[in-house]
Amino acid sequence: MFAPIVRQHPGPALVTSTKPDLFELSATERVRRGPVRVLDPDRLAPSGTRVRWSPVAGCEDSRVAERRAQALVAASGDDTGSTAQFFRQSAADVLKGYLHAAALDGRTMRDVLAWSARPTDPTPMRILAENPGTAVDWAGTIGTHTSGAEQTTSGVMRTLARALACFGHSDVMEMCCPAPGEQFDVDEFLASSATVYLLGKQPSAGAGGVAPLLTAFAEELLDAAERVAAGRSGRRLDPPLLALLDEAPSICPIPSLPQRLADGRGRGVVVMYGMQSPAQARDRWGPNGAEAMNDATTVSVILRGLRSVDDLEDLERLCGQCRIQRHSKSDSVGGRSVTVASELEPVVTVAEIRSLEVGVGLVLWDDFPQVLAYLPGLWEDRKGWKAISVEEAATRAANDAARHPAALTRILVE
């Protein structure tokens, strides 16, 4: 469903996915439009040109440090309970201080990770206390959360460790500590028709995963899009930026997504997102955030496979009712009579929504009546699919070769 959109978009594109398929189906076409890069800590598409990006860059600005810390920590768990929220907010308060201190003192994510492993290390607090450009009392905030009651402190630092877990891998850390001149240029990206793919596996239960890194990068890019749009004619990007967030709750749960959906279109930022069910949005952004996302989403496409009875019933009610006339005939001594009864029935039932045909979507668009739409796959364009399938196979082979170079060498030798 998403591949044709990515292939045809005329402007810059930010694309997320938990599988390499979307990259393999669209990357070759995107190269024809502009540079293609991947932020791919799990090596789902290792043949792609890698993004080098430092989460510390720009954090001399306390507002940037705060937003980046929020994005990193928010993506580390989907428990919306009050205790979990307290620990996440406290961890973000510590992390924003670490990022701010690292940027002010010319340090890197290696230092941030080291400080998080040694909460009693006074270095970040000293940097903040001695630097006149620091935010007000962020050093004290770090001290409050790292030297308080043991149970509270351990909870905060466990949450922080989960948010930074992916940086413990040497290849990921190397990716996030670019040399001078290697840092991903966001402004250059937005001025082109380039593409960046953010790829990562679904995190397993209890694991930190790569979602924090991908989310922080996406948030940075969308923040930059708003800034650049403000200086453009009409205060919007033209052509627009496409932010296509497949599996958004799992791999790229941008904290500000509800707000981005509400006002992105006016800035030339087209946000599309995919999820398994509405319940995922409630788990990740909370009931209020999920409701705000739903209200700000102009077009919703529901595909087969939804299993939650509550969600199915909500959709049935949303589609409304229609009046049906039923005719019944009866014979009697006096002759035949016809009775007409009028009843209200759902336009689309729970059973019909749950068992939609493959390739058919229930489309809800603003206040227009819902429709069932056929969504043709790329393969149905026989002429075009022949070329696309060749491109896909070549990209997949390149990925396989990059994952297993030794095996490829043996095959060539034999």
Model-derived segments and their meaning:
Residues 261-365:
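Conserved ATP-driven motor cores of ASCE-family P-loop NTPases powering translocation/secretion/packaging/pilus
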Residues 29-32, 55, 287-290, 316-320, ...:
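Short secondary-structure boundary/capping segments
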Residues 1-269, 351-372, 382, 387-414:
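P-loop NTPase motor domains
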